[in-house]
Amino acid sequence: MAYGASIDHIQTYTPEYLGNQAQNGMINNASVYYNPAGIVNLEKGTYVHVGAQLAVGHEKMEYKGEEYKADLFQPIPNFAMYKVEDDSALYWTFGGIAGGGDLKYDDGVAGTAVVGDILQGIGEKLKPLTNNINIFATANTIGSKAEGKNLYAQTTLGKVWKIDNRLSVSAAGRLVYGIRELNAELRLNGVKDIPSSSGGNLFEGNYANIDSERTAWGYGIQLGLNYQATERLNLAMRYDSRVRLNFKADGSSYSNIKIGGIGLGFENFYPEYIDGNKTRRDLPAILAAGMSYKVTDNWTVGLSGNYYFNKDAKMDRTAGKISVPMPQGNLEIKGLEAEYDNGWELALGTEYRFSPKWAILGSINYADTGAKVTSYDDVEYALNSVTLGTGLKYNPDETTEWIFTVCHFFYDSESGHYDVKYAGYPTVSNPSYDKSITAFVVSYTKRF
Protein backbone atom coordinates (compact mmCIF):
# COMPACT_ATOMS: atom_id res chain seq x y z
CA MET A 1 0.00 0.00 0.00
CA ALA A 2 2.94 2.27 -0.43
CA TYR A 3 2.35 5.68 -1.98
CA GLY A 4 4.80 6.77 -4.65
CA ALA A 5 8.24 5.14 -5.03
CA SER A 6 8.28 1.34 -5.41
CA ILE A 7 6.74 -1.85 -3.93
CA ASP A 8 6.94 -1.09 -0.21
CA HIS A 9 9.48 1.74 -0.29
CA ILE A 10 8.52 5.38 0.02
CA GLN A 11 10.76 8.36 -0.71
CA THR A 12 8.76 10.94 1.22
CA TYR A 13 11.24 10.95 4.10
CA THR A 14 11.12 14.73 4.60
CA PRO A 15 8.78 17.66 3.84
CA GLU A 16 11.20 19.29 1.41
CA TYR A 17 11.08 16.23 -0.85
CA LEU A 18 7.37 16.67 -1.47
CA GLY A 19 8.03 20.15 -2.85
CA ASN A 20 11.21 19.28 -4.75
CA GLN A 21 11.55 15.55 -5.43
CA ALA A 22 14.94 15.90 -7.13
CA GLN A 23 16.84 15.79 -3.83
CA ASN A 24 19.55 13.21 -4.56
CA GLY A 25 22.05 15.78 -5.83
CA MET A 26 21.06 18.73 -3.65
CA ILE A 27 22.98 20.12 -0.68
CA ASN A 28 20.48 21.46 1.83
CA ASN A 29 18.83 20.61 5.14
CA ALA A 30 17.08 17.58 3.60
CA SER A 31 20.36 16.09 2.35
CA VAL A 32 20.79 14.14 5.57
CA TYR A 33 18.17 11.76 4.12
CA TYR A 34 18.91 11.86 0.38
CA ASN A 35 22.55 12.93 0.00
CA PRO A 36 24.19 12.39 3.39
CA ALA A 37 27.68 12.62 1.90
CA GLY A 38 26.89 16.22 0.93
CA ILE A 39 26.02 17.59 4.38
CA VAL A 40 29.70 18.17 5.17
CA ASN A 41 29.46 21.13 2.76
CA LEU A 42 26.86 22.91 4.91
CA GLU A 43 27.72 25.60 7.44
CA LYS A 44 29.43 24.25 10.55
CA GLY A 45 27.14 23.62 13.49
CA THR A 46 24.63 21.25 15.04
CA TYR A 47 21.32 20.91 13.20
CA VAL A 48 17.97 19.78 14.54
CA HIS A 49 15.28 18.92 12.01
CA VAL A 50 11.62 18.09 12.74
CA GLY A 51 9.00 17.35 10.10
CA ALA A 52 5.37 16.27 9.89
CA GLN A 53 3.43 14.95 6.91
CA LEU A 54 -0.28 14.27 6.53
CA ALA A 55 -1.27 11.99 3.67
CA VAL A 56 -4.97 12.02 2.77
CA GLY A 57 -6.94 10.46 -0.04
CA HIS A 58 -8.29 7.04 -0.89
CA GLU A 59 -7.44 3.66 -2.31
CA LYS A 60 -10.19 1.76 -4.08
CA MET A 61 -11.11 -1.34 -6.02
CA GLU A 62 -14.01 -1.85 -8.39
CA TYR A 63 -15.64 -5.19 -9.04
CA LYS A 64 -18.67 -5.66 -11.29
CA GLY A 65 -19.54 -1.99 -11.05
CA GLU A 66 -19.36 -1.90 -7.25
CA GLU A 67 -16.78 0.33 -5.57
CA TYR A 68 -14.82 -0.81 -2.51
CA LYS A 69 -13.06 2.19 -1.05
CA ALA A 70 -10.85 3.01 1.93
CA ASP A 71 -10.05 6.55 3.01
CA LEU A 72 -6.47 7.40 3.93
CA PHE A 73 -5.60 9.74 6.79
CA GLN A 74 -2.01 9.04 7.77
CA PRO A 75 0.33 11.32 9.76
CA ILE A 76 4.06 10.65 9.25
CA PRO A 77 6.66 12.30 11.51
CA ASN A 78 10.40 12.54 10.89
CA PHE A 79 13.35 13.69 13.00
CA ALA A 80 17.03 14.26 12.29
CA MET A 81 20.11 15.59 14.05
CA TYR A 82 23.48 16.16 12.46
CA LYS A 83 26.71 17.88 13.39
CA VAL A 84 28.89 19.42 10.69
CA GLU A 85 32.58 20.09 11.33
CA ASP A 86 35.48 21.17 9.10
CA ASP A 87 36.23 17.81 7.48
CA SER A 88 33.53 15.47 8.80
CA ALA A 89 29.94 15.20 9.95
CA LEU A 90 27.82 12.90 12.10
CA TYR A 91 24.14 12.29 11.38
CA TRP A 92 21.09 10.51 12.76
CA THR A 93 17.65 10.20 11.19
CA PHE A 94 14.34 8.67 12.19
CA GLY A 95 11.10 8.33 10.25
CA GLY A 96 9.08 6.29 7.80
CA ILE A 97 10.83 4.24 5.15
CA ALA A 98 8.07 2.11 3.64
CA GLY A 99 4.40 1.17 3.83
CA GLY A 100 1.19 3.00 3.14
CA GLY A 101 -0.69 3.54 6.38
CA ASP A 102 -3.95 2.16 7.76
CA LEU A 103 -6.81 1.42 5.33
CA LYS A 104 -10.31 0.34 6.34
CA TYR A 105 -12.71 -1.05 3.73
CA ASP A 106 -16.10 -0.93 5.45
CA ASP A 107 -17.91 -2.61 2.56
CA GLY A 108 -15.37 -5.35 1.97
CA VAL A 109 -12.86 -5.72 -0.85
CA ALA A 110 -12.78 -7.29 -4.29
CA GLY A 111 -11.40 -10.49 -2.74
CA THR A 112 -14.50 -10.92 -0.59
CA ALA A 113 -16.95 -9.80 -3.28
CA VAL A 114 -15.65 -12.42 -5.71
CA VAL A 115 -16.50 -15.28 -3.32
CA GLY A 116 -20.19 -15.08 -4.20
CA ASP A 117 -19.36 -15.38 -7.90
CA ILE A 118 -17.01 -18.30 -7.24
CA LEU A 119 -19.81 -20.09 -5.43
CA GLN A 120 -22.17 -19.36 -8.31
CA GLY A 121 -19.57 -20.94 -10.61
CA ILE A 122 -19.36 -23.97 -8.31
CA GLY A 123 -23.14 -24.15 -8.36
CA GLU A 124 -23.04 -24.45 -12.14
CA LYS A 125 -20.62 -27.37 -11.86
CA LEU A 126 -22.84 -29.08 -9.28
CA LYS A 127 -26.04 -28.86 -11.35
CA PRO A 128 -25.92 -32.58 -12.31
CA LEU A 129 -26.17 -33.32 -8.57
CA THR A 130 -28.79 -30.70 -7.71
CA ASN A 131 -31.62 -31.30 -10.19
CA ASN A 132 -30.06 -28.85 -12.66
CA ILE A 133 -30.51 -25.96 -10.21
CA ASN A 134 -27.71 -23.56 -9.29
CA ILE A 135 -27.91 -23.80 -5.51
CA PHE A 136 -25.63 -20.75 -5.12
CA ALA A 137 -27.44 -18.49 -7.58
CA THR A 138 -28.18 -15.89 -4.87
CA ALA A 139 -24.83 -16.10 -3.05
CA ASN A 140 -23.32 -12.74 -2.07
CA THR A 141 -20.97 -11.27 0.55
CA ILE A 142 -22.83 -8.13 1.64
CA GLY A 143 -21.70 -7.16 5.14
CA SER A 144 -18.09 -8.24 4.69
CA LYS A 145 -15.29 -5.83 5.64
CA ALA A 146 -11.51 -5.60 5.74
CA GLU A 147 -8.78 -3.46 7.28
CA GLY A 148 -5.06 -3.52 6.55
CA LYS A 149 -2.04 -1.67 7.85
CA ASN A 150 1.52 -1.55 6.48
CA LEU A 151 3.98 0.67 8.37
CA TYR A 152 7.78 0.63 8.45
CA ALA A 153 10.01 2.87 10.58
CA GLN A 154 13.77 3.34 10.31
CA THR A 155 16.59 4.90 12.26
CA THR A 156 19.97 5.56 10.64
CA LEU A 157 23.27 6.58 12.25
CA GLY A 158 26.23 7.54 10.10
CA LYS A 159 29.36 9.59 9.48
CA VAL A 160 30.65 11.71 6.60
CA TRP A 161 34.30 12.23 5.65
CA LYS A 162 35.56 15.08 3.46
CA ILE A 163 38.28 13.66 1.23
CA ASP A 164 39.16 16.99 -0.41
CA ASN A 165 37.42 20.20 -1.46
CA ARG A 166 35.39 18.34 -4.07
CA LEU A 167 34.83 14.79 -2.80
CA SER A 168 33.12 13.49 0.34
CA VAL A 169 31.85 10.03 1.31
CA SER A 170 29.47 8.67 3.94
CA ALA A 171 28.69 5.37 5.65
CA ALA A 172 25.87 4.46 8.02
CA GLY A 173 24.04 1.62 9.70
CA ARG A 174 20.26 1.34 9.58
CA LEU A 175 17.66 -0.42 11.75
CA VAL A 176 14.14 -1.07 10.41
CA TYR A 177 10.94 -2.23 12.11
CA GLY A 178 8.00 -3.35 9.99
CA ILE A 179 4.41 -4.12 10.88
CA ARG A 180 1.76 -5.54 8.53
CA GLU A 181 -1.78 -6.20 9.77
CA LEU A 182 -4.86 -7.84 8.30
CA ASN A 183 -8.27 -7.79 9.98
CA ALA A 184 -11.15 -9.02 7.84
CA GLU A 185 -14.59 -10.63 7.96
CA LEU A 186 -16.36 -12.62 5.26
CA ARG A 187 -20.14 -13.00 5.51
CA LEU A 188 -21.90 -15.29 3.05
CA ASN A 189 -25.55 -14.57 2.31
CA GLY A 190 -28.04 -16.47 0.19
CA VAL A 191 -26.43 -19.85 0.90
CA LYS A 192 -27.39 -22.86 2.99
CA ASP A 193 -25.93 -26.24 3.87
CA ILE A 194 -26.04 -28.67 0.95
CA PRO A 195 -26.20 -32.38 1.93
CA SER A 196 -24.10 -34.90 0.03
CA SER A 197 -25.51 -38.21 -1.17
CA SER A 198 -22.46 -39.93 0.33
CA GLY A 199 -23.02 -38.39 3.76
CA GLY A 200 -22.06 -35.08 5.31
CA ASN A 201 -22.41 -31.84 3.35
CA LEU A 202 -21.16 -30.71 -0.03
CA PHE A 203 -21.23 -27.20 1.37
CA GLU A 204 -21.76 -25.67 4.81
CA GLY A 205 -21.08 -22.47 6.74
CA ASN A 206 -21.43 -18.74 6.18
CA TYR A 207 -18.70 -16.88 8.09
CA ALA A 208 -14.91 -16.48 8.23
CA ASN A 209 -12.57 -13.96 9.85
CA ILE A 210 -8.92 -13.21 10.45
CA ASP A 211 -7.12 -10.87 12.83
CA SER A 212 -3.37 -11.10 12.35
CA GLU A 213 -0.29 -8.95 12.82
CA ARG A 214 3.07 -9.60 11.19
CA THR A 215 6.17 -7.93 12.59
CA ALA A 216 9.87 -7.99 11.76
CA TRP A 217 13.18 -6.30 12.58
CA GLY A 218 15.93 -5.86 10.02
CA TYR A 219 19.13 -3.95 9.44
CA GLY A 220 21.14 -2.60 6.55
CA ILE A 221 23.85 -0.18 5.53
CA GLN A 222 23.89 3.11 3.66
CA LEU A 223 26.80 4.37 1.56
CA GLY A 224 27.05 7.79 -0.06
CA LEU A 225 29.30 9.87 -2.31
CA ASN A 226 29.18 13.57 -3.18
CA TYR A 227 31.31 15.29 -5.81
CA GLN A 228 31.30 19.05 -6.42
CA ALA A 229 32.34 19.10 -10.07
CA THR A 230 32.27 22.90 -10.32
CA GLU A 231 31.06 25.79 -8.23
CA ARG A 232 27.64 25.34 -9.83
CA LEU A 233 27.40 21.60 -10.59
CA ASN A 234 27.05 18.99 -7.85
CA LEU A 235 26.86 15.21 -8.38
CA ALA A 236 25.89 12.60 -5.79
CA MET A 237 25.12 8.92 -5.34
CA ARG A 238 23.66 6.85 -2.49
CA TYR A 239 23.26 3.11 -1.97
CA ASP A 240 20.79 1.72 0.57
CA SER A 241 21.33 -2.00 1.04
CA ARG A 242 18.58 -4.60 1.06
CA VAL A 243 16.98 -4.97 4.48
CA ARG A 244 16.16 -8.59 5.23
CA LEU A 245 12.85 -8.82 7.10
CA ASN A 246 11.56 -12.18 8.31
CA PHE A 247 7.98 -11.41 9.31
CA LYS A 248 6.32 -13.56 11.96
CA ALA A 249 2.52 -13.66 12.17
CA ASP A 250 0.67 -13.46 15.46
CA GLY A 251 -3.09 -13.70 15.34
CA SER A 252 -6.17 -15.82 14.95
CA SER A 253 -8.56 -16.92 12.25
CA TYR A 254 -11.89 -18.73 12.14
CA SER A 255 -14.10 -20.23 9.49
CA ASN A 256 -17.16 -22.48 9.52
CA ILE A 257 -17.18 -22.64 5.72
CA LYS A 258 -16.50 -26.05 4.19
CA ILE A 259 -16.70 -27.35 0.64
CA GLY A 260 -16.61 -31.12 0.32
CA GLY A 261 -15.50 -31.33 3.93
CA ILE A 262 -12.46 -29.10 3.30
CA GLY A 263 -12.27 -25.89 5.32
CA LEU A 264 -12.09 -22.61 3.44
CA GLY A 265 -10.94 -19.38 5.11
CA PHE A 266 -8.65 -16.37 4.79
CA GLU A 267 -5.63 -18.49 5.66
CA ASN A 268 -6.08 -20.40 2.39
CA PHE A 269 -5.44 -17.23 0.40
CA TYR A 270 -3.12 -15.35 2.77
CA PRO A 271 -0.94 -18.13 4.26
CA GLU A 272 1.65 -15.55 5.37
CA TYR A 273 -0.88 -14.32 7.97
CA ILE A 274 -1.43 -17.73 9.63
CA ASP A 275 -0.51 -17.59 13.32
CA GLY A 276 3.15 -18.53 13.80
CA ASN A 277 4.00 -18.36 10.09
CA LYS A 278 7.39 -16.86 9.20
CA THR A 279 7.76 -15.37 5.72
CA ARG A 280 10.47 -13.17 4.24
CA ARG A 281 9.41 -9.84 2.81
CA ASP A 282 12.54 -7.73 2.37
CA LEU A 283 12.94 -4.05 1.58
CA PRO A 284 14.83 -4.03 -1.74
CA ALA A 285 18.16 -2.28 -2.15
CA ILE A 286 18.11 1.20 -3.73
CA LEU A 287 20.70 2.90 -5.92
CA ALA A 288 20.02 6.65 -5.93
CA ALA A 289 21.83 9.23 -8.05
CA GLY A 290 21.33 12.88 -8.76
CA MET A 291 22.72 16.23 -9.81
CA SER A 292 21.98 19.85 -9.05
CA TYR A 293 22.99 22.89 -11.06
CA LYS A 294 22.89 26.54 -10.02
CA VAL A 295 21.65 28.27 -13.14
CA THR A 296 21.96 31.60 -11.32
CA ASP A 297 22.73 32.56 -7.74
CA ASN A 298 18.99 32.36 -7.00
CA TRP A 299 17.87 29.49 -9.23
CA THR A 300 18.83 25.82 -8.83
CA VAL A 301 17.57 22.86 -10.85
CA GLY A 302 17.97 19.19 -10.01
CA LEU A 303 17.61 15.77 -11.60
CA SER A 304 17.28 12.57 -9.54
CA GLY A 305 16.84 8.88 -10.25
CA ASN A 306 16.25 5.83 -8.06
CA TYR A 307 16.60 2.18 -9.02
CA TYR A 308 14.97 -0.52 -6.88
CA PHE A 309 16.44 -4.04 -6.91
CA ASN A 310 13.13 -5.81 -6.36
CA LYS A 311 14.18 -9.05 -8.02
CA ASP A 312 16.92 -9.59 -5.43
CA ALA A 313 14.50 -9.32 -2.52
CA LYS A 314 12.18 -12.00 -1.18
CA MET A 315 8.68 -10.52 -1.16
CA ASP A 316 5.74 -12.72 -0.06
CA ARG A 317 5.71 -14.87 -3.17
CA THR A 318 3.77 -17.71 -1.46
CA ALA A 319 0.45 -18.47 -3.17
CA GLY A 320 -2.51 -19.96 -1.32
CA LYS A 321 -4.31 -23.02 -2.71
CA ILE A 322 -7.13 -25.44 -1.90
CA SER A 323 -8.08 -28.68 -3.65
CA VAL A 324 -11.48 -30.21 -2.85
CA PRO A 325 -12.50 -33.74 -3.96
CA MET A 326 -15.89 -33.46 -5.68
CA PRO A 327 -18.10 -35.98 -7.52
CA GLN A 328 -17.40 -34.20 -10.80
CA GLY A 329 -13.63 -34.12 -10.18
CA ASN A 330 -11.34 -32.08 -7.95
CA LEU A 331 -12.26 -28.46 -7.39
CA GLU A 332 -9.16 -26.27 -7.26
CA ILE A 333 -8.92 -22.64 -6.19
CA LYS A 334 -5.42 -21.26 -6.12
CA GLY A 335 -3.63 -17.96 -5.95
CA LEU A 336 -0.94 -16.71 -8.29
CA GLU A 337 2.65 -16.23 -7.20
CA ALA A 338 3.38 -12.51 -6.99
CA GLU A 339 5.92 -11.35 -9.57
CA TYR A 340 8.06 -8.22 -9.56
CA ASP A 341 10.45 -6.54 -11.95
CA ASN A 342 12.99 -4.02 -10.74
CA GLY A 343 11.51 -0.56 -10.24
CA TRP A 344 12.74 2.93 -11.06
CA GLU A 345 11.75 6.56 -10.78
CA LEU A 346 12.95 9.85 -12.23
CA ALA A 347 12.41 13.35 -10.83
CA LEU A 348 13.00 16.88 -12.10
CA GLY A 349 12.92 19.70 -9.57
CA THR A 350 13.68 23.35 -9.09
CA GLU A 351 14.19 25.92 -6.34
CA TYR A 352 13.98 29.65 -6.97
CA ARG A 353 14.80 32.20 -4.29
CA PHE A 354 12.73 35.29 -5.01
CA SER A 355 13.81 37.18 -1.89
CA PRO A 356 16.49 36.77 0.80
CA LYS A 357 13.97 35.01 3.05
CA TRP A 358 11.70 33.16 0.64
CA ALA A 359 12.13 30.49 -2.04
CA ILE A 360 9.63 28.53 -4.10
CA LEU A 361 9.95 24.80 -4.84
CA GLY A 362 8.52 22.74 -7.68
CA SER A 363 8.95 19.24 -9.10
CA ILE A 364 7.58 16.32 -11.07
CA ASN A 365 8.32 12.64 -10.48
CA TYR A 366 7.50 9.46 -12.41
CA ALA A 367 7.61 6.11 -10.60
CA ASP A 368 7.52 2.66 -12.22
CA THR A 369 7.10 0.32 -9.25
CA GLY A 370 8.05 -2.89 -11.04
CA ALA A 371 4.97 -4.66 -9.65
CA LYS A 372 3.36 -7.07 -12.11
CA VAL A 373 -0.38 -7.67 -12.26
CA THR A 374 0.07 -11.00 -10.45
CA SER A 375 1.06 -9.06 -7.32
CA TYR A 376 -2.21 -7.11 -7.13
CA ASP A 377 -4.59 -8.21 -4.38
CA ASP A 378 -6.61 -6.82 -1.51
CA VAL A 379 -3.59 -6.07 0.68
CA GLU A 380 -1.23 -4.77 -2.02
CA TYR A 381 -1.45 -2.99 -5.33
CA ALA A 382 1.64 -0.89 -6.05
CA LEU A 383 0.59 1.27 -9.00
CA ASN A 384 2.79 3.43 -11.21
CA SER A 385 2.40 7.14 -10.56
CA VAL A 386 3.18 10.71 -11.52
CA THR A 387 3.70 13.14 -8.64
CA LEU A 388 3.52 16.93 -8.78
CA GLY A 389 4.83 18.92 -5.84
CA THR A 390 5.36 22.52 -4.84
CA GLY A 391 6.07 24.52 -1.73
CA LEU A 392 7.72 27.44 0.00
CA LYS A 393 10.95 27.73 1.95
CA TYR A 394 11.18 30.46 4.59
CA ASN A 395 14.42 31.55 6.28
CA PRO A 396 13.65 34.20 8.92
CA ASP A 397 17.36 34.28 9.82
CA GLU A 398 20.60 32.53 8.87
CA THR A 399 20.09 29.63 11.32
CA THR A 400 16.38 28.89 10.91
CA GLU A 401 14.36 27.32 8.13
CA TRP A 402 10.66 26.56 7.70
CA ILE A 403 9.32 24.53 4.78
CA PHE A 404 5.69 24.23 3.69
CA THR A 405 4.91 21.84 0.83
CA VAL A 406 2.06 20.00 -0.84
CA CYS A 407 2.04 17.29 -3.48
CA HIS A 408 -0.44 15.09 -5.28
CA PHE A 409 0.07 11.53 -6.53
CA PHE A 410 -1.65 10.63 -9.81
CA TYR A 411 -1.85 6.84 -10.08
CA ASP A 412 -2.41 4.63 -13.10
CA SER A 413 -5.61 2.59 -12.87
CA GLU A 414 -4.91 -1.10 -13.44
CA SER A 415 -6.94 -4.27 -13.92
CA GLY A 416 -6.40 -7.35 -11.78
CA HIS A 417 -5.83 -11.00 -12.63
CA TYR A 418 -9.07 -12.77 -11.70
CA ASP A 419 -9.47 -13.74 -15.37
CA VAL A 420 -6.39 -15.95 -14.89
CA LYS A 421 -6.73 -16.83 -11.21
CA TYR A 422 -10.35 -17.98 -11.59
CA ALA A 423 -10.25 -18.93 -15.26
CA GLY A 424 -12.69 -21.82 -14.73
CA TYR A 425 -15.43 -19.58 -13.37
CA PRO A 426 -17.21 -17.57 -16.08
CA THR A 427 -19.28 -15.80 -13.41
CA VAL A 428 -16.12 -14.06 -12.15
CA SER A 429 -15.06 -10.66 -13.51
CA ASN A 430 -11.78 -8.76 -13.30
CA PRO A 431 -11.36 -6.09 -10.60
CA SER A 432 -9.70 -2.73 -11.15
CA TYR A 433 -7.45 -0.82 -8.76
CA ASP A 434 -6.90 2.90 -8.28
CA LYS A 435 -5.58 5.44 -5.76
CA SER A 436 -5.59 9.18 -5.20
CA ILE A 437 -3.38 10.71 -2.51
CA THR A 438 -2.42 14.25 -1.50
CA ALA A 439 0.16 15.10 1.15
CA PHE A 440 0.48 18.30 3.19
CA VAL A 441 3.78 18.87 4.94
CA VAL A 442 5.69 21.22 7.24
CA SER A 443 9.21 21.10 8.67
CA TYR A 444 11.47 23.14 10.92
CA THR A 445 15.27 23.13 10.95
CA LYS A 446 17.50 25.00 13.41
CA ARG A 447 21.28 25.32 13.36
CA PHE A 448 23.09 25.88 16.65
Indicate where each model-derived feature is located.
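Solvent-exposed loop segments that connect transmembrane elements
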Residues: 108-142, 179-212, 247-276, 313-335, ...
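Transmembrane beta-barrel strands of outer-membrane/channel proteins
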Residues: 48-56, 92-96, 171-175, 237-241, ...
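Residues on the lipid-exposed face of transmembrane beta-strands in outer-membrane beta-barrel proteins
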Residues: 38, 50, 74-85, 155-161, ...
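Repeated loop/turn-to-beta-strand initiation elements of outer-membrane beta-barrel proteins
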Residues: 46, 87-90, 166-169, 232-235, ...
